[in-house]
Amino acid sequence: MPDKGFPADPRTRFRFAVALATIAGIADAIGFMQYSQLFMSFMSGNTTRMGEAASSADWVGVARFGTVIAVFCFGAFAGTLIAAWSGRWRLPALLLTQATLLLTGILIPHGPEAVPWHVYPIVLALGLQNATLQDESGRSLALTYVTGSIVRFGAGLANMLLHKPSPSFWIQGPLWAGLAGGAVIGGVLQRAFGEAAFAVPATFLLTLAVMALLLTIKHPTNDLVTSAHAPQPDARPEAKPTVSV
């Protein structure tokens, strides 16, 4: 069955994926530097910090890191539902939501250390981002963390030597480079603009949302976009859709 994930064209999907990984790196670096080494998308790091806080009976730290992890998980949950319900509009809908959440994080007042609600919209946006794109098998592409990408790239190289190459393992390298480059950009922006630097990745997301919306309107039935037969996130390509558009 032909690939119907949005964007259906692999070249378009690849460009969007690298762009989104770069944006995630920008946002994570800004948040890490701005909010006392609290990760916006690297939940492995926050999990380690939460465990360290628990070991020293720092319950404020446990609450701080634990709530951020929960919000990120909810973002992935909500993003998957939005993607499934939005049909061909999934990309503009998710990107616009992410841009709005990043700007919201700048505007709301700061919460206490144990419950930093001002970072929750930003973390939620980055959780949503992981449901934005699918690979050719209908699985969501992880765009905000790279440990899995590095593992898959290494395993892909080994499988290539074993004459069992994965068709898309090579994309993991550019995704890592995008996230790493974004982190450099985010660090520079945070030093220059502080918390207001989040407006930069929000603007990038808004620009991508407009591009995706124009593509969807201009090519509503083209494989470049998708159709009602597109698989849901994390589903096999032959899976039946639950929404008709």
Describe these PLM feature segments:
Residues 1-13, 223-227:
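Short, Lys/Arg-rich, polar N-terminal cytosolic tail immediately upstream
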Residues 18-28, 37-40, 101, 113-144:
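Hydrophobic core of transmembrane alpha-helices in multi-pass small-molecule transporters
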Residues 40, 45, 51-52, 57, ...:
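Substrate-agnostic recognition of the 12-TM MFS/MFS-like secondary transporter fold
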Residues 75-88, 190-191:
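Helix-to-loop junctions at the C-terminal end of transmembrane segments
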Residues 87-98, 116-121, 141-146, 173:
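Cytoplasmic-side transmembrane-helix entry/capping segments in multi-pass membrane proteins
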